[in-house]
């Protein structure tokens, strides 16, 4: 069956401002720079590689549909939505609230298309029109909690999609697996009390946000036990991530048996990413994707939707993403040109500290019903 693919030209037009992280600041002697760390060119280069590699011929292009207010309000507060409308209407846009998440004038349109792209792909996969798919959306979403924008994220795209699956499509159990290297704090916040969405975050311990993503953060009320954090030590690579998949993630998914799996697909755990200190390669992401796709085939008739999150290496992110796309289509196209350079740098042996960090999570899975 067809594999869906979402890209919109406007995803490459996200205005990240003139600074490298926060806005340029003459007083602090922070120079303007042409490429913010979250500059949209990185995602655009991924899309262009999908086309140049020939993978686009094996995908079904899906037009993004702008998320409605009703879609957004399933994950966010009315106050947050109104604030984003306000910032978007400023003559030159502005800071959405945390000092690093900028929105240009009219940027709300792109944010709606990003969340809406995830929703539209989810709808088509959930209804059987497509077997699976990849939404290469921008801006990302997993840091945005219920009431705010944060960490380059305006709306929480995976949560907006999960909310749609629950409220409109009638799904009773949805899982969100987030392997972006930074803690999925926004997703955790939105579903904290709700067992109808299982949230799993694999991330570098204490990277971003500060003081967030501990294994002890497990949800509350009826949602206790349905939020799983797997904080990994800096320097973790393919071996640690695959051990976490095998010992925690796949067991959690099989215990929960969701009707749909949504993957927050960030590639900032790669060896070449500037915003983390992990050592995953394109082949590591390939193997993680393969395991998750196979798990979906076993437990939810293959219904799986990948939604782009972070990743800040314009050099390597496209090839990490291509590896995941290839696992969806079942067609190999290009080898990883960085493989030989990275192969000897480590990350392929499971270290004791990594094993311990992962295996302390295993007993927590007993609370999933």
UniProtKB/Swiss-Prot annotation:
GO MF annotations, alphabetized: histone deacetylase activity; hydrolase activity; metal ion binding
Record site feature (Polarizes the scissile carbonyl of the substrate), residues: 312
EC numbers: 3.5.1.-
Keywords for the protein's UniProt record, in alphabetical order: Hydrolase, Metal-binding, Zinc
Residues annotated as binding Zn(2+): 180, 182, 268
Regulation of its function: Zinc, and cobalt and nickel at a lesser extent, are able to increase the catalytic activity (2.2-, 1.3- and 1.1-fold respectively) at concentrations of 1 mM. Higher concentrations have an inhibitory effect. Magnesium, manganese and calcium have no effect on activity at concentrations between 0 and 10 mM. At 100 mM, the catalytic activity is increased between 1.2- and 2.1-fold. Hydroxamates like TSA and SAHA inhibit the enzyme. Is also inhibited by azobenzenes, stilbenes and arylazopyrazoles.
Pfam family, one: Hist_deacetyl
Key word Metal-binding present: yes
Active site residues of this protein: 143
Record text on cofactor binding: Binds 1 zinc ion per subunit.
Cofactor: Zn(2+)
UniProt record similarity statement: Belongs to the histone deacetylase family.
Subunit composition and interactions: Homotetramer; dimer of dimers.
PANTHER family: HISTONE DEACETYLASE HDAC1 (PTHR10625:SF10), HISTONE DEACETYLASE HDAC1-RELATED (PTHR10625)
Stated role: Exhibits significant levels of protein deacetylase activity comparable to those of eukaryotic HDACs in assays both with fluorogenic peptidic substrates and acetate-radiolabeled histones. Accepts proteins with epsilon-acetylated lysine residues and tritiated-acetate-prelabeled chicken histones as substrates. The natural substrate protein is not yet known.
Protein's name according to its UniProt entry: Histone deacetylase-like amidohydrolase
Gene for this chain: hdaH
């Amino acid at each position: 069956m067809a594999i869906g693919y979402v890209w919109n030209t406007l995803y490459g037009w996200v205005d990240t401002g003139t600074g490298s992280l926060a806005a340029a600041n003459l007083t602090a002697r922070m120079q303007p720079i042409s490429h913010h760390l979250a500059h949209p060119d990185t995602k655009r280069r991924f899309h262009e590689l999908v086309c140049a590699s020939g993978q686009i011929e094996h995908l079904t292009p899906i037009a993004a549909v702008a998320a409605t207010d009703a879609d957004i309000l399933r994950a966010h507060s009315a106050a947050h939505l109104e604030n984003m409308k306000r910032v978007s209407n400023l003559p030159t846009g502005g800071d959405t609230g945390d000092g690093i998440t900028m929105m240009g004038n009219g940027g709300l349109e792109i944010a709606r298309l990003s969340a809406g792209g995830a929703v539209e792909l989810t709808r088509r996969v959930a209804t059987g029109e497509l077997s699976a798919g990849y939404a290469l959306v921008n801006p990302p979403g997993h840091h945005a909690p219920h009431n705010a924008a944060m960490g380059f994220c305006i709306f929480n795209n995976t949560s907006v999609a999960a909310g749609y699956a629950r409220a409109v499509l009638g799904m009773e159990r949805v899982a969100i697996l987030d392997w972006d290297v930074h803690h999925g704090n926004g997703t955790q916040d939105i579903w904290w009390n709700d067992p109808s969405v299982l949230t799993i975050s694999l991330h570098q311990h204490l990277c971003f946000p500060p003081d967030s993503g501990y294994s002890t953060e497990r949800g509350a009320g009826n949602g206790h036990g349905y939020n799983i954090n797997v904080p990994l030590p800096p320097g973790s690579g393919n071996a640690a991530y695959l051990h976490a998949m095998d010992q925690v993630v796949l067991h959690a998914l099989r215990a929960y048996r969701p009707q749909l799996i949504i993957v927050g697909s960030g590639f900032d755990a790669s060896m070449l990413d500037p915003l983390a200190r992990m050592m995953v390669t394109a082949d590591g992401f390939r193997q993680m994707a393969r395991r998750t796709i196979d798990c979906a085939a076993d437990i939810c008739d293959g219904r799986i939707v990948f939604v782009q999150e972070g990743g800040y290496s314009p050099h390597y992110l496209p090839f990490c993403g291509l590896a995941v796309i290839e696992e969806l289509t079942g067609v190999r196209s290009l080898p990883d040109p960085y493989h030989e350079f990275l192969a000897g740098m480590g990350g392929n042996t499971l270290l004791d500290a990594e094993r311990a960090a992962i295996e302390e999570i295993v007993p927590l899975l007993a609370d999933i019903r």
